[in-house]
């Protein structure tokens, strides 16, 4: 802070020819009034006032915005220092946001974390496939049996991915209701929606479909869905399903070297470059009421359809990554591979040149 020397008034004696006016008060206050009322003292006070008004400090304060209108009430000198700093070669640095363990490495390299990027305007998902909707026990059993037969015919595949999701009503007064809808997708051209409202017990064929040895169930936060399904329908055992399922968010972090928890909507943005219409009106609707309307059916179908699309994309990325890693090790050795891997290389793209 700059310091300014301000000339203080000096005490002078009254001229003998002048007669001061009669003053009232105690002797102490009268002496003070005498000092203030002298002509010399008044003139010096005026000079001091003018001198103070002309100081650079107050001139800058007059130019700056009033304190009440400034977001940060800086002193005039600080305002001047900030202006000089902005005019210099090095502009003031903004305080960095708090870094989490998952985003620290990317932030240090100056690369934004993909899952933290502001979503761009993406086209909405348009599902044009079939939606097979069933509400009766025997209909659900027959449909599940048809899916099992289709899976058994896929003799060239050791694993058949099947997108899985659930819906249930929710009330702020009573909390989540009983599991009301199960939707699955094994082929992007057809989604199955099973409404469970009339069922006291799940059909054996549906339970067999979920536990099929070739089926790989996948979804987002899918383990919590299985636990809820077991609570609502005890004939379902959650542990075997959890052991063989794939959480798409966790898998994405492993393949793409990202971090944090994912929602299905954000995964669709990041992987499929599509936007999802997550209408609260539909999401919080009465899923237990039969029949479901067109908006509910489309909402349920899109959830598993885009899940299947994301799985296929991640599966392809994993193949490319493993192939690139194998080629790099063969050409450069394990030591170079570990060094490049430590630098954050994902190997999702082919590396043609290495500089360490």
Swiss-Prot record:
SMART domains the record matches: 35EXOc
Binding locations of Mg(2+) 2: 165
Domain of life: Eukaryota
GO molecular function: 3'-5' exonuclease activity; metal ion binding; nucleic acid binding
Gene3D superfamilies (alphabetical): Ribonuclease H-like superfamily/Ribonuclease H
Stored InterPro entries: 3'-5'_exonuclease_dom (IPR002562), 3-5_Exonuclease_domain (IPR051132), RNaseH-like_sf (IPR012337), RNaseH_sf (IPR036397)
Compositionally skewed regions (Basic and acidic residues) per UniProt: 29-56, 71-85
Enzyme Commission number, as recorded: 3.1.11.-
CDD domains documented for this protein: WRN_exo (cd06141)
Positions carrying Phosphoserine: 105, 113
Biased segments, Low complexity type: 99-113
Region named Disordered: 1-120
One GO term (biological process): nucleobase-containing compound metabolic process
Pfam family, one: DNA_pol_A_exo1
Sites where the protein binds Mg(2+) 1: 165, 167, 303
Localization of this protein: Nucleus
Cellular component terms (Gene Ontology): nucleus
Domain 3'-5' exonuclease: 155-316
PANTHER family associated with the record: 3'-5' EXONUCLEASE, 3-5 EXONUCLEASE
Family, as annotated: Belongs to the WRNexo family.
Biological role: Has exonuclease activity on both single-stranded and duplex templates bearing overhangs, but not blunt ended duplex DNA, and cleaves in a 3'-5' direction. Essential for the formation of DNA replication focal centers. Has an important role in maintaining genome stability.
The protein's name in its UniProt record: 3'-5' exonuclease
Species per Swiss-Prot/TrEMBL record: Drosophila willistoni (Fruit fly)
Gene it is expressed from: WRNexo
């Amino acid at each position: 802070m700059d310091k300014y020397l301000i000339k203080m008034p000096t005490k002078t004696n009254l001229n003998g020819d002048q007669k001061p006016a009669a003053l009232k008060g105690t002797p102490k206050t009268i002496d003070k009034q005498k000092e203030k009322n002298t002509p010399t003292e008044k003139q010096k006070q005026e000079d001091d006032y003018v001198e103070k008004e002309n100081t650079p400090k107050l001139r800058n304060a007059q130019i700056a915005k009033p304190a009440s209108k400034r977001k940060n009430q800086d002193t005039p000198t600080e305002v001047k220092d900030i202006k000089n700093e902005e005019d210099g070669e090095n502009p003031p640095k903004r305080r960095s946001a708090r870094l989490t363990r998952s985003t620290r490495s990317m932030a240090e390299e100056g690369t934004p974390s993909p899952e933290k990027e502001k979503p761009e305007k993406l086209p909405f998902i348009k599902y044009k496939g079939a939606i097979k909707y069933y509400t009766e026990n025997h209909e659900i059993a027959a449909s599940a049996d048809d899916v099992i037969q289709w899976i058994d015919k896929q003799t060239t595949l050791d694993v058949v991915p099947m997108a899985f999701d659930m819906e249930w009503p929710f009330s702020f007064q009573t909390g989540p209701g009983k599991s009301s809808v199960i939707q699955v997708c094994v082929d992007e051209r057809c989604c199955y929606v099973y409404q469970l409202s009339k069922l006291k017990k799940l059909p054996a064929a549906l339970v067999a479909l979920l536990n099929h040895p070739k089926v790989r169930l996948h979804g987002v936060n899918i383990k919590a869905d299985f636990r809820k399904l077991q609570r609502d329908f005890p004939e379902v055992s959650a542990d075997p399903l959890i052991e063989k399922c794939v959480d798409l968010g966790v898998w994405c972090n492993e393949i793409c070297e990202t971090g944090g928890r994912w929602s299905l909507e954000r995964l669709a943005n990041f992987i499929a470059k599509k936007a999802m219409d997550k209408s609260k009106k539909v999401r919080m609707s009465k899923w237990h009421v039969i029949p479901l309307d067109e908006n509910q059916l489309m909402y349920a179908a899109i959830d598993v359809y885009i899940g299947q699309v994301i799985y296929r994309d991640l599966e392809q990325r994993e193949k490319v990554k493993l192939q690139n890693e194998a080629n790099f090790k063969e050409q450069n050795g394990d030591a170079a591979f570990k060094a490049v891997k430590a630098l954050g290389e994902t190997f999702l793209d082919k590396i043609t040149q290495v500089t360490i």
